[in-house]
Amino acid sequence: MKVAVFFNPDGVRDEIKQKLFDTLHSLDFKYYLADFNNADDTIEKCDIVLALGGDGTIMHAAKRAALHNKKILGINCGHLGYNAGLEANELNLLYMLKIGEYKVDYRMMLKITIGDKNYYCVNDAVVCKGALSRMIEINATFGGAKMHYRADGLIFSTPTGSTAYSLSAGGPAIEPTLDCISVTPICAHSLFSPPLVVRPDTEIVVEIDSDSRGDAYLTLDGETAIELDTKTPIKITKADVYAHIVRIKEDGFLKILKEKIK
């Protein structure tokens, strides 16, 4: 088995990395180090990606792996590690990859289209105000049904991302292997702005209202920020690719939710 090892160089202790390399060597896995910012060539030639780090690193790697139709196993070296399949002290369980004793969850992703550019998200796409701006005015269309929001922002989340920023803003925790899109307002200035869950085939179009004052941005999985204007609509749909998340342990959704988010 060929393995792409993916980690943030500044985020993982040397002794953990060395233990991983020793474990892979003992299992006769051929492994390659993937560049954090340019991993595509390495991922393409491997069978599976091992992402060593916290949730941000794991989700960043999951997105890259999904675009190459590759599986990913997250190994938690961070604080929460909600989407990790193993903890850093469980590297001895990697032998289960060799004998095929694991399952793969297929996680829905989002495709974001702005003009002629496409972007992909594993967790969420967030339309939000700038740091010093007042609340923004957002027009959103859900398969033809129109909604208007006055808020600090809107979170469009996959089920995988529902337990991240969306949950903190009052959105629902959704079983991560479902296909749907959750929509959670951030500090809405309205008595009727409930979180929504819509069908995965719903085409969502978002525009910043011309009456909106101040800057507005779109952030993708918390790592890419795009400044928005009032002229260019944002189209949000279910992506045509899935993140392939490897699970070695038999922990279910509710057990992980209870243990990780206290």
Regions found by a protein language model. Give the residues of each.
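ATP/NTP phosphate-donor binding region
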Residues: 1-48, 52, 60, 64-67, ...
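A residue-level signal for conserved active-site and pocket-lining positions in enzyme catalytic cores
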Residues: 8, 50, 76, 125, ...
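Short glycine-rich anion-binding loops that position phosphate/pyrophosphate groups of nucleotides
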Residues: 54-57, 78-80, 160-163
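Proline-centered loop/turn at the N-terminus of a beta-strand
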Residues: 69-71
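Catalytic core of DAGKc-family lipid kinases
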Residues: 80-152
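A generic structural signal for short beta-strands and their flanking turns/coil linkers
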Residues: 106-110, 121-123, 134-138, 152-154, ...
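ATP/nucleoside-binding phosphotransfer catalytic cores, i.e., glycine-rich phosphate-binding loops
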Residues: 119, 127, 132, 143-146, ...
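Gly/Ser/Thr-rich active-site loops/lids in small-molecule metabolic enzymes
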Residues: 148-152, 156-192
